[in-house]
A protein has these predicted regions:
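Non-catalytic, polymerase-adjacent accessory regions of viral genome-replication enzymes
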Residues: 1-36, 379-382, 387-389
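Right-hand nucleic-acid polymerase module
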Residues: 68-69, 77, 189, 194-205, ...
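Short, conserved non-catalytic motifs in the polymerase core
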Residues: 17-25, 50-74, 90-102, 176, ...
Length: 439
């Protein structure tokens, strides 16, 4: 049986950084009684996963995301607290996503060091092979993953709540959120998703919901089998989710690995994305998780630079109208990019774009800190924003609703596909209906 203290720990872990969300606030109002009820449901095997919300995000590409209720997310954190330490002891050091002390930047630095080591400080030839998986999260076969996780728990977990953990893991892995969900995005947005990219259309028992904590944890666990097989034949390799790069002195070393990689993936119900495969000399540069690694230097990919330019333009537009709230939001976006660029060799690019895109009048609202490390709203406007935000939080209760106003590009694509869009307003909210032209 699960002890109350364990569930309480999972609750505090779950609400961290999420305390102001509607679900967390409602649960916290009576969190002790809510936790007791949840505990009783689990121990009596009456617990059932609740309705999820589902929406489509547009940036950086169209993706379907599911989010469980807050009480269900507590269960996800309970599972992670129990299994993550055990998984960590068996993960390869060459896996960098969603792990403490790792991360995207650490993976990029490791790959740079690997290239330097294999090429003997850029004095010898070295080759890189990049591979990606096709529709990774949506291709995961649930029964196989559930069995692998259950076998792992049987062998490695020895807590008093072992049977509860097995029962809950099987439930969350085999759950079909698409069968009981509330769509927060307009239906027409699903038209931009390929069938294999949605749980609604990719086939029975295929896919785990992007957006839930356990998805990343169990995905790492699933691919750890491939990590260790690659590690046996090729010491220098890095993986971030389903993006992998291998480095070797000779071409043949890398090419001989392809049959083994395909065979291992097939045993897991996965396959390579042939369109994203590349094989080249290190001197041509290596693209990995949003960065271009070249000799002694790391750059951002063009998409990131273009998006940074767009964020600076939005800041300039907000400053032109003197909208302090819009300026504050735009500054957050600009600073997120400046934070990324601070780790790369991009000082000249940052300086050039900011100077090109910001009007002279815009500078009265903010200042640049350090060597283009961040943008900061001037103090007198910051104070105004503080009190305005306090008033808005009182007057307007925050919700999890999302804006689904179609962009001009989306409208054009839907019309080309033979659909018609009808937009109308109910209770001050914009609604969009999409239907075939012949209906």
């Amino acid at each position: 049986m699960i002890d109350f203290s364990i569930l309480l720990e999972a609750y505090f872990d779950c609400r961290r950084h999420k305390r102001k969300t509607v679900g967390a606030t409602e649960f916290e109002m009576n969190y002790m009684s809510n936790l007791v009820q949840l505990l009783d449901e689990i121990n009596s095997r009456q617990y059932k996963i609740g309705k999820s919300i589902c929406f489509v995000v547009r940036y950086p590409r169209y993706r379907e995301v599911f989010a469980g209720q807050f009480r269900d997310r507590i269960i996800h954190h309970y599972i992670a607290l129990r299994l993550e330490p055990l998984f960590e002891s068996q993960f390869s050091d060459r896996t960098y996503n969603c792990r403490k002390g790792k991360g995207q930047l650490a993976g990029i630095r490791q790959l740079q060091e690997d290239i330097m080591e294999v090429s003997e400080n850029y004095t010898e030839d070295a080759y890189v092979m990049g591979i990606d998986l096709k529709g990774f999260f949506m291709s995961i076969y649930k029964p196989l993953l559930a069995k692998m996780v259950d076998d792992f728990i049987v062998r490695n977990y020895h807590g008093d709540d072992k049977e509860d953990l097995r029962w809950l893991c099987n439930m969350v892995v085999m759950h079909h959120p698409e069968k009981d969900c509330e769509k927060k995005s307009a239906d027409y947005l699903w038209e931009f998703l390929p069938k294999e990219k949605s749980l609604f259309t990719n086939g029975e028992d295929r896919g785990v919901a992007i957006g839930n904590l356990f998805a990343q944890l169990f995905a790492n666990f699933l691919l750890s089998k491939l990590d260790w097989k690659i590690d046996y034949y090729c010491k220098h390799h890095v993986r971030y989710v389903d993006d992998m790069v291998l480095v070797a002195r000779r071409k043949e070393t890398l090419l001989r690995l392809m049959p083994m990689i395909r065979e291992t993936l097939a045993s897991l119900g996965l396959r390579l994305n042939e369109k994203k495969f590349y094989f080249q000399h290190y001197s041509k540069g290596v693209r990995f998780v949003g960065a271009i690694i070249k000799r002694d230097r790391i750059y951002s990919v063009n998409n990131t630079i273009n998006n940074f330019r767009k964020s600076v333009r939005k800041l300039n537009d907000a400053a032109r109208y003197g909208d302090i709230e819009a300026i504050s939001h735009a500054i957050q976006s600009v600073n997120s990019y400046l934070g990324i660029f601070g780790h790369y060799n991009e000082y000249g690019m940052k300086r050039q774009i900011i100077k090109e895109e910001l009007d002279e009048e815009a500078w009265k609202f903010f200042v640049i800190k350090g060597h283009y490390r961040s943008v900061q709203l001037k103090k007198r406007y910051n104070i105004d924003m503080k009190y305005k935000n306090m008033a808005n939080e009182i007057l307007n209760h925050k919700t999890e609703e999302r804006k689904d106003i179609p962009t001009e590009n989306e409208i054009s694509k839907m019309l080309d596909k033979g659909y018609e869009l009808e937009m109308y307003i109910i209770d001050g909210r914009i609604h969009v209906e999409c239907y075939p032209r012949d209906s």
